[in-house]
Amino acid sequence: ATSNYIVKFNDNLNILNFHENIYKNKIVYKKNLFIPKSILNNFNNSIIFQNNDFIVINKWAQIATQGGSKINISIDHIIKNISPNYRLVHRLDKETSGLLIIAKNLNNAKLFSNLFQQKNITKLYLALCEGNPKLHQSQVSLDITNKKLKLDNTLTNYKVLNTKNGISQIMFNPKTGKTHQIRIVSKNLGSPIIGDNKYN
């Protein structure tokens, strides 16, 4: 076709070498964001379950779940390049690895959100922490200051699974979902998470 040809309904378009040139090494995202092939491979390799409704990945550490002013690439960026219908159901901190649910459409995202709100999904986190809490199993009620400088009441169950050489493996079961809840609770226990530069 010539450069001044106007595309009409039912026209067939053929873009030469489209997949080879566009998708061989990267995928284009809105605002000119490019997702390197290596990161796409990481995402595909992280999938541990998938059906027609949702995906479960084992999110690797050091990638953000959502974008932000200082975030170049996030899981949200990646899934939006795969399909604009994909939706995050919950989030994990950038430094945290673990299971992350991705709904394949808005309706399924709402279903999962309701399951989380109704406490029908149990969240369990494992962390290596410094020291050894006085109580090896307990429930912590703690007020945490949020971004609006208001107090949020949090509730967290924890259990020490193993201790060795001044390090404890602790399982946390947060009953509320506040920002940095587990990190703040572990610090309050006197056993901050190893490698947590913000709360250690």
Question: What positions do the PLM features span?
Answer:
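RNA pseudouridine synthases
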Residues: 1-200
